[in-house]
Amino acid sequence: MTINRVATTAINQSSSQVARETKVRRKLVKERSRLKRATVRNPNAKIIVNRGDLPVIKLGIRMLGRRPNSILKAGQHRYQRAFIQRLKNGRWHVMQRVAGKNRYPIDVVKIPMAAPLKQAFDENVDRIRRERLPGELASALKQQLRIAIKR
């Protein structure tokens, strides 16, 4: 369906834009969005986006130095006084000491994704709907007419 093609374009362009802004691989951003496809019965496509923060462990980790105050590099990001630790739930995460927190002085290092994802999807979905949808619908209608006339 035409709507599904336009929605897929919106997902791809939004994911690329967010990946550039946050300096995260496009694949990691794109897998956070799903498309509930439009059907003949329900002609509405629905884009579902996980806007939660992205844990840094997903970027791939390199330790620069083995001192207590060493730098941990994840993708293009650098984190001072960070370390890798296995949590009680069995997952590995990058942790960092947080100044000013008395009770739990370490925290999982995350990249905030909510604001860039919301902004990019709002902009791109509206723009692509305005620009691409009429042309796509026209070409789909032409194709259906071509098929119907051939019979």
Language-model features and meaning:
Residues 1-151:
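Short, Lys/Arg-rich flexible segments
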